[in-house]
Amino acid sequence: MLKSKYLFLSLICLLTSFRLHAQFMDYGSDPAKFKWNIARLPHYNLVYPQGNDSMAYRYALFLENVYPHMSKTIGKPIKAKFPVILHPGNMQSNGMVSWAPRRMELITTPSSDLNNQSWDKHLVLHESRHVFQTGKVMHGIFKPLYYIIGEQAAGVASFFLPVWFLEGDAVSTETAMSNGGRGRLPEFNMVYRAQMLGGKKNYSFDKWLMGSYKNYTGTYYALGFDMTSYARQRYGADIWDKSTSRYIRNLLFEGSFKHYTGSSFKRLQHDTFDFLRAEWEKQDTCTQSPQYLSPAKETYTSYRYPQPINDSIVIAVKSELKDINSLVIINNGREKHLDYIGSINSRLSYRHGRVYWSELVPGLRWTHQNYSIIKYYDLDKKNIKTLTPRQRYLSPAIDEQGQHIAVSRPTVEGKNQLVLIQAEKGNELAAFDVPDNAFIKELTFAGGDTIISIAVADSGIRLLQFNFGNGIWKELLKTASANITSPVWKDGKIFFESGANGTNNIYSLNPADGQVRRMTAARFGAFDPSFGSSDGRLFFSDYQADGYRIASLPTDSMLFEKADLNRPASMPFVETLAAQEQFNLDSARLTSVDFNPKRYRKAEHTFKIHSWAPFYYDVAEAMNSGASDLSTIVKPGATLMSQNTLNTAIMQAGWYIDKGYHHGKLSFIYQGWFPVINLSVDYGDKAFNVDWTQNDKGQDITQGHYTQRNLVEAEARVYLPFNLTHNQRIRGIQPALTYYFTNNKYQEYHSRKFHNFQYILPEILFYDYRRKAQRDILPRTGYQLRLQYLKTPFNSENYGSLYAARLTTYWPGIIRNHGLMIRVGYQYQDLDNKALYLPKHLLEKPRGYHFQYQTRQQWAFKADYALPLLSPDWSIGSLIYIRRLRANLFYDLSRNQASSKSRWSN
C-alpha cells in the first residue's frame, strides 16, 4: 500500500517537474524530401534516410554486437525492440534516448571535438547504456505501471535516478568498452583538478551538480563519470546493478546505494574528490613559467584559439558567464572588443588581415537540416563576412599566401572528404575522399601543396599528409589511444596538442625521423598552439581555475622532451572499468548482422500510440504551466498519446470531466511538410445561443441562453517557422493562419439568421534578438513584432474586423545582465454599422486585470525591468538549491476607447 502511494506521488511529481520536457521531447523533424528505410534487427528497429545504407549498416553492426555485453554491470532491460532513428542532415552532433515514445535518436555527423574514437562507436556505446538504464528500471514495482500509463512509465521509474548517475554511467561505459571515451581525456576532469589544486576553494556537491551563475562548475557528465566510476572501483563492478535492482523494489535510489555501501551520494562525491585530489597532487608539477598576454580576471573568463598578429598582439575568442562569445584583440595585456560571433565550431586561423573560422547556421525550416559555413573577420574593414554558401565545412586551414582554404566535409551520405576552397570568393575547387573514410577533424597547411590532417577511423587517430597537387596520401603518425588535436606547421615540424602524459600539453612531430617531443609542461592544460612570425615564440591557451589565459613561450623555454604517444598515461578509473566490462568494441571480433532494409512509408506510420493514462492531463499545458495547483492540469478522465517515429505527427486524445460535463478533446500536430499544421477539437459542455430581442423600452438588445447542444470548439492553425538566425542574432519570420470554430450561435442583427461563431486570423511574426549570456535574464537587444487581422466571415452583420500590432523591444539595463523589456500594442475594431463587439481581444490585458471590457481602440504599454539580486549557491536540506534570486519590476498601462463617441479611459 505504501509503495502504491509512492508510485502515485512519483507520477504527480513527474507531471509538474522539469523531467516532463525530457519525457515528451519533440526532437524535431527532417526535410520532407527524405525517403526512409527500416532495418528490423534482433533488438532494434533502425530507421534511416535512403542513400545511407553503408552508414546504417555500421550502426546496426555496432548496436547488435554491443547489446549482449551492455548488461554486465547494469542488468537487463525489457525485451521490446527499441527504435533507432538516424539524422544525417544535422551538423549539431549529438544523441538522445527518450522515454515516451521509446526511441534513440542519433545525429550521425561527427563532432569536430571528437577524440580518438569514431563517432558512430561513441554514440552507440553511450546511448545503448541509456537504453539499458531505462529498460532496467521497468522491472519490479514499475512493471505493472506500463499497463496503466504506457511508455511514460519509464519516466516515472526514472524520476528518482539523478542525471549525474544516468550520464556518468554512460560515459563510464563508453570509456570502458573502447580505446577512447571521454574518461580517457585529461581535459574532461580539468575543471575539478584546477579548482582543487589551484582554486581559492572547493565547492559543495550540490554546487558542482546544480551549477552556478557565479562560478563555472563544469558538467554533470564529468561529475557523474567520476562518482559512478569511483563507486565501481571501491564497491565492485556490480554496485549500480545492485542499487538499481533494489531501487525497483523500494523506490529509494540513494537508500539502495547506501544499503550496499553505507555511503550517501554526498559522501560518495566527497570520497571521489579526495581520491582524485591525491592522484592529481602526484602530478602537480610545473617547470615552466610562460608569459601571459591576456589579463587575469576575478570571474571565470576564457580566451581560446590565440592567433598572433605579431609577438605582442593576439586575436582570440573570449567567453565568459556575463557575455556571449566575442572576438577580441589583445595588445600587451590591453583588450579590445572586435565583434560578437555565432556558434563557432572550429579554431581561428589568421592570414593577411583576416581571421577565419567555421560556424554552425540553422536551416530555413527543418531541425535536422543545418549547415557549417566559413566566415572571416576583416581587420581593415572591421566587419564579419560570410565566405561560403550553406555547406558542411569544418575546421578551415588557410595556406600561407591566403589563396586556398582546406576544410573537412562529412557528407549527408556518410562520406568524409577533404575540400579545397578558393579563399577570395569561397567557391569549391576540388574534393578528395579520405583513405578508409576517416573523419578529418582538423587540418593545417604545411607549405606548398601539402596539407596535414588529423583523421579518426576505426583503427584510431592518425596524422595524415596529403598533396593536392598529385593526390597522394601519406601516414605520418598512427596512435591507438592518445588523443591529438590542433595541428600547426612550423619550420618543418608539426605541432599539436595531446593529453598523452596525463595533462594536456603541446607536442611536436618531426616527419623526417618520426620523433615526437613534448614542448610544454602545463599545470592543468595547454591548448590551441600557434606561432609568432618572427622569433618562433609559441602561443597557447593555458587553463587555470578561473578560465583559459593566453600564454607564450620562447623557443629556449620549450622542453623538447621525447614522448611516446602509443603509451599514454593511464587516467583514473579507466583500467578498472575496462577490466570489469571485459569487452572492447575497438578490438572485438564483430559478428555480422542480417541487414535487410525495407521501404519505410511515412503515411503508414503517421500514428504510434505510446502512452495512456486513467486520468486526463494536457501535456502541452503541463509543460508550459507554472501552476502549483494540480487541479488545473489533472482531471478525471482518460488520456491517449501518439508520437510517430519520425517526429512528424504528435497527437493527444482524451476524455475528461470538468464542471460536471463530459468532454472529448483531440489535438494533432503535423510537421512533416513545409508548413506546420496544428489541429485541436474540444467536445463537451453546453453550447449557447445569443439572439436579439427588445427590452421594455423597445430597444434591441442581446440575450444569451444555454441550449441542449454539446459545445464544439475547434481550431486549425497553419504556420511557417522560418529560421533566419545570423551570427549572434536569433532571427526569424513566422507567417500563420488560424481558423476558429465554435457551435455557439449568434443571431445576425438584420437577417435574424443564426450562425456559428467562427473567425480567421492571419498574422505574421518578425523577431530579431541577441543570444543570451548565461547570466542574462532577458535578451540584451532585440525586438519582436506581431501583426494580426481577425475577421468573422459568417457573422459580418454583427461583427467588424479586428486589427492589432504588438511590438516588444529589449534594451540593456543599468548594470550588466539587467534587462529592460518594453511592450507596446495597438488594437482597432471596425464598429461601423456593426451591432456587437467581438468577444475576442488580441492585446493582452494589464496584469491583475480580468474584467471583460468593450473596446473600439486600445493602446497598451508594458515595461519590465529584470535584474538578478543574488547568486548565493545555497543548499537548504537535500530538496532545495538556490542558484539565483532575481526580481522583475513591471508597470502596465492600457488606454481604451469603447466607441467613437466615448472618452478614453485607463
Language model: regions and residue ranges:
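A flexible loop/linker signature enriched in serine peptidases of the S9 family
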Residues: 183, 300, 318-326, 339-345, ...
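Outer-membrane beta-barrel initiation region
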Residues: 289, 299, 498, 557-674, ...
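Feature captures outer-membrane beta-barrel proteins of Gram-negative bacteria and organelles
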Residues: 376, 508, 636-644, 662-683, ...
